[in-house]
Every structure is written in C-alpha cells, then in structure tokens.
Design a protein with these regions (language model features):
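Helical substrate-recognition/capping region of FAD-dependent monooxygenase/halogenase enzymes
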Residues: 43, 48, 53, 138, ...
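Core Rossmann-like FAD-binding/catalytic domain of the broad FAD-dependent monooxygenase superfamily
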Residues: 1-259, 365, 418
Length: 422
C-alpha cells in the first residue's frame, strides 16, 4: 500500500504454493473459509459451576457494596506501558507477577521499565472512553510517570478448533486454540504447533514424508491444545477463588486488617502456585496416540501429572535435556532431520540403509556418557526433527523399513510396536 497527499494505491500479490499454513489469529479467515468450527468452554459458566452460584453472587454483591465497582462482565482491559518510576511497582522487591485479590495483574515484561496491567471490566463499561493512565493509577493506588504503548479491551476465551486443517491448508497457533493467559500456554502452544507443522510440511515437500504426517500433526497438537485448555481453565478458577476472598478490611491498618490478611494469605497459599509450577504440563506432554511414532506394547509409561515432570524417552515424549561430561548440551548434537542416538556399540547399517531407501534424513550420533544413557533409557533412540522421540530400543529393529515408514507417516491408525513386528 502506498499513500500520497492525493491518493492511496494498493497492489495485490498472488503467490502460488503447494500448501498454505493459516497462522492468522483467533479470528482466522482461513479457518472460517474451511468452515471449521470452534469448541468453546464458557469461562463464566465454569466459574459459577465450580464456585457455586451463591458464592459467586455474594462476591459480586460485596465488591459492589464495598467499592462501587460494577460486576465484571468477562472482559479485561490491558495497558502496556513503560515507566521511569519502576521502583514504585517493585516496592516489595523485584517480582514478575503482582496479582491482586481484586482480580487485576501487573506483569513485569523485561525486569526493568516495561509492564502490563490486566484488569477486569465492569458491566456496561465503554472501553473506548477509558483513560489508560487513570485506569492504571486507580488500580495501583498512586500516580506516577508512564508512557502508554498499547491499551485495549479483550475477552479471555477457552476454545479449540474442531479440526486443524485438511488437504493443502493447515492451521496453527491462535487460529486453532485460544486460552486464558493463566499459565502462559497460549504462545507456547502456538510455537509447538509451528514446529510440528513445519517439519511435517518439510517432509512432504522434500518427498520423504507422506500426507500422513499432516494428519499426525493434527492428532498430536490438538491433544496438547485440549490439555492446555483444561489446565488454563483450572488456573482461572484459582484466580476466581482468590477474588472471592477479597474484603475491604484487607486494607485496614487496624487489628482486623492484619487478621484478615493472615487468614486470606493462608487461603491463597492453600490454593497453591501451580499456575507457575506446572512442569508436567510444560515439559511432560507426550504424543501417546500419534500414528507417526513407534509405540511400545509393554512396559509402564511414566505417570503424567500437572506438577511433576519425569524425564523419559517414552515414545512420543520430548527427550530429556542433558549436559554431557564435556560440557556440551546433548540437544545441540541433534540434526535437522531424524537423529539416531547410539549410546552403545550396535551395528545400525540396516537401519541407516532403510532410511536411505525411503529418502528419510537420518544421522547417527554416537554418545558415550553414562548419565545421558541412564536418562535416555535405551541404547538406541530416534529423535524426530521436532525433538520428540519416534522410536527406541536396546537393539536395532527387526524390520527397519517398518519403523522408517511409520515415522515418515506411511502407516496410519494402528499402534503396532516394533517389538511386535520383530
């Protein structure tokens, strides 16, 4: 688009391609063109169901009575700003998140001068008439110098698309899932989508991968999106429970205020800090039903919980991060294609030959490190380009072509293990 004093000129470009990746956000036109629906969890109904209608109504009524704040309608208002008076926001020491029982949160974006405030909006509030500076000052309780970078209303959503694409058009990121910011899963899930879709498209375009990789992408990433939506909803409920504890006497300097703060502090502590400590969600997700992974028929898969991460090379998992004895990170040894990690002396000539026969990029990386071998659990581990485990074993596979075909998307719908094949 070119603008001048007298005219605006637009030039449309057409770029043909074999595939289209729709990464066009929550209002994705690509998704709508494909007529793909969204499965949505209504956050307000969820809060009422989990906290109970009487408690929810009592909380809203008390907030209005004590502060004359209108009951929240589900929207939030964000103000992204910089300030030279950062010490005002760090008066109790440097923190990343400051969360108020009133429902607002201040986030330190750079451990310096940049912050974001998110605060609920009351029913009937016209967001276009809000003065961002006054909005911030009213919630933080004092005035200070600030430069507003961005300010707008937004509505938290908990949605997952019914499909992640089809044929030559596939979707990723907010186009297929939107979650509340609680836990920070939105962008992180989208990055995982980009990696998952990227290597699948590369495989198909380079000729060694089949369209089955794209179907596997949907199965793998949609399961993660559903899991992260459930977890983000759980964290939002904790926030709602904290808001339900809010009382005007929290701010009293008298003995009742101190007593109330101690009691509510215990209640908040009992709710836990899983929103910031859910390592099982952040690191421990697996593609347990993927058609592009060689699953195991025996053994016990590591237990999956929100708060615990168990390092493992169980097929479909992300392999553990290990620093080798010489100081190198094992992840830095992974290749752009598939990586066959060899922790012991095994002849993998047939395995490498099978990959070459199918045109699959497979590099052998020898690792002689006792600690790494213990964490990786097998003598041989194949890691996919997206750094998920595709196959593992203590001996080379009896039918290497079967393994190679499966991890390139040429087998669909079964969970046939290599142990069964051999």
């Amino acid at each position: 688009v070119r603008r001048s004093a007298s005219a605006t000129t637009a030039r449309c470009l057409s770029n043909p391609g074999r595939f289209l990746a729709g990464c066009d956000g929550a209002g994705s036109r690509t998704r709508r063109q494909l007529d793909i629906g969204l499965d949505e969890t209504d956050l307000r109904k969820l809060v009422v169901r989990e906290l109970g209608l009487p408690r929810t109504v009592a909380t809203l009524a008390r907030a209005f009575r004590e502060t004359r704040e209108r009951p929240a309608d589900g929207r939030f208002y964000l103000v992204h700003f910089t300030t030279p008076d950062a010490e005002i926001l760090n008066r109790f020491g440097g923190v990343w998140h400051v969360q108020s029982p009133a429902g607002w949160t201040v986030i330190s974006q750079n451990d310096g001068d940049t912050f974001t405030l998110h605060a609920p909006l009351g029913m009937g509030t016209d967001a276009d008439r809000i003065d961002p500076r006054e909005f911030v000052h009213a919630r933080l309780g004092r005035r200070f110098e600030m430069d507003v970078l961005v300010a707008n209303a937004w509505t938290p959503r908990l949605t997952v698309a019914d499909s992640f694409g089809r044929g030559r058009v596939w979707l990723a990121g907010d186009a297929v899932h939107q979650v509340t910011p609680t836990g920070g899963y939105g962008m992180n899930t989208g990055v995982g989508d980009a990696v998952g879709l990227g290597w699948a498209l590369a495989g198909v375009l380079q000729g060694w991968g089949t369209p089955g990789l794209l179907r596997a992408y949907e199965q793998e990433r949609r399961s993660v999106a559903l899991r992260n939506r459930r977890t983000a909803a759980r964290h939002s409920l904790v926030r709602a429970a904290v808001m339900a504890t809010n009382r005007a006497e929290l701010h009293s300097e008298r003995w009742l205020g101190a007593r109330t703060r101690r009691r509510i502090g215990r209640e908040i502590s009992d709710l836990g800090n899983l929103e910031n400590e859910a390592l099982g969600i952040e690191l421990g997700y697996r593609y347990d039903t993927s058609p592009a992974v060689c699953h195991e028929s025996g053994g016990q898969a590591p237990r999956q919980t929100m708060d615990e991460y168990t390092p493992s090379t169980w097929p479909g998992a992300r392999p553990p991060s290990v620093l080798l004895a010489d100081g190198r990170a094992l992840f830095d040894l992974f290749r752009r294609g598939f990586t066959l990690l060899r922790f012991a002396d095994h002849d993998v000539t047939a395995f490498v030959g099978a990959a070459a026969e199918r045109g699959v990029p497979l590099d052998v990386v020898d690792v002689r490190d006792t600690r790494a071998r213990a964490l990786y659990e097998r003598d041989l581990v194949v890691v996919r380009p997206d750094q998920h485990v595709a196959w593992r074993g203590d001996t080379p596979p009896g039918d290497p072509l079967h393994v190679i075909d499966r991890i390139r998307g040429a087998h669909h719908g079964t969970r046939r293990s290599d142990q069964e094949k051999s």
